[in-house]
Amino acid sequence: METLYNGTLTLGGKDQESTGFAWWAGNARLINLSGRLLGAHVAHAGLIVFWAGAMNLFEVAHFVPEKPMYEQGLILLPHLATLGYGVGPGGEIIDTFPYFVSGVLHLISSAVLGFGGVYHSLIGPETLEETFPFFGYVWKDKNKMTNILGAHLIILGIGAWLLVWKALYFGGVYDTWAPGGGDVRIITNPTTNPSVIFGYLLKSPFGGDGWIVSVDNMEDIIGGHIYIGTINILGGLWHVFTQPWAWTRRAFVWSGEAYLSYSLAAISVMGFVACCMSWFNNTAYPSEFYGPTGPEASQSQAFTFLVRDQRLGANVASAQGPTGLGKYLMRSPTGEIIFGGETMRFWDFRGPWLEPLRGPNGLDLNKLKNDIQPWQERRAAEYMTHAPLGSLNSVGGVATEINATNFVSPRSWLATSHFCLGFFFFVAHLWHAGRARAAAAGFEKGIDRFNEPTLSLRPLD
């Protein structure tokens, strides 16, 4: 009897007998069929772009301009808004037509990719080496593999430069730090000082250092893309025009599964970095679109109650809380004036709504008494009730469920999904790296079990 698992099932003319892989091994059946593998990749790209376009239009159709983006479960429109499309002062969405255009362009692109995927999967040549040698390859051809690596790096570099051109010449990008509560602006002076850009890479990832996640201005972000785009393009050209050195030929495993494992490791790292960026960073991920960070929501609550009680006559500089520490304000271990209460743990938070109230030694008491602007109060009150937490209780000094809004923050979605995906990709890297190394060593089929003692034991029944 034929089942899905006995190896006799044939899908697309590829069965376990002819390929060495069962149907559920997917593209492994196409390892040596470059034309069919091209079809799988193009079709996969079509699915990705189709999702982007369809989800984009879905978000546009459900978008309510009167509510904050982060309260509506949106994850794509915030990215478009961050690029400066359809946004006005203070992060207000004034035009959704660019978002509609983006969705339609992605859908049209996905149709082209989908057609290409179907064509190369079913109609085009099974292998490209004979008919299109430029696009053909053999996995063990080290020079060809580094040529392909170089082409990918060049395309990534161009992608980084597209953001630079958008920021410098094509309308600018949204800057949450623009005076008055954020605005779209042209980045006229991107950071090109290598000590600043590479200084982020040399920072500790812990505490207040934060590695590259600590970037806090658009000049550094765009300058970083100038560097990474240029390095990618130059590195791509290097890999296209050179051949691997002897030590790299010896050090790496040169097979399709090995390249898959390397790619999975790289995308795993990107997933973990994206997790941290989307959770902690409020410059690359402006809070106007993604909602406040955890520390930001906590500091917002302290600020909101300071404003309220100060209006009611409280002396916010000297009032004590139940622990004897300052109720509204206190000093950090280094002597800076910070917010008191549970939010003291987030004393090093930086946000565009709070920074104007700082002085040379932390929060400026005179500014807190005389210079608080209405937009700062409104934003803090909004952020206070939109902490990116799943907890219904007061955690870290943020609003309890009585005061909070019942929603899931885009930061929660993005950080959690990218952490999980990053983890799974890392496990997949270990799996495929182990298989690739085993195959290179000649024992990928596992240990011979013919003499396994278990096989000679009497059956239990």
Swiss-Prot record:
InterPro entries: PS_antenna-like, PS_II_antenna-like_sf, PSII_PsbC, PSII_PsbC_sf. Residues 1-2 form a propeptide. [CaMn4O5] cluster binds at residue 355. PSII is composed of 1 copy each of membrane proteins PsbA, PsbB, PsbC, PsbD, PsbE, PsbF, PsbH, PsbI, PsbJ, PsbK, PsbL, PsbM, PsbT, PsbX, PsbY, PsbZ, Psb30/Ycf12, at least 3 peripheral proteins of the oxygen-evolving complex and a large number of cofactors. It forms dimeric complexes. GO terms for molecular function: chlorophyll binding; electron transporter, transferring electrons within the cyclic electron transport pathway of photosynthesis activity; metal ion binding. Binds multiple chlorophylls and provides some of the ligands for the Ca-4Mn-5O cluster of the oxygen-evolving complex. It may also provide a ligand for a Cl- that is required for oxygen evolution. PSII binds additional chlorophylls, carotenoids and specific lipids. The lineage of its organism: Eukaryota, Viridiplantae, Chlorophyta, core chlorophytes, Chlorophyceae. It is a multi-pass membrane protein. The modification Phosphothreonine is found at residue 3. The chain crosses the membrane at residues 57-81, 122-143, 166-188, 243-263, 279-300, 435-459. Belongs to the PsbB/PsbC family. PsbC subfamily. It is found in: Plastid, Chloroplast thylakoid membrane. Its main location: plastid. HAMAP family: PSII_PsbC_CP43. This is Photosystem II CP43 reaction center protein.
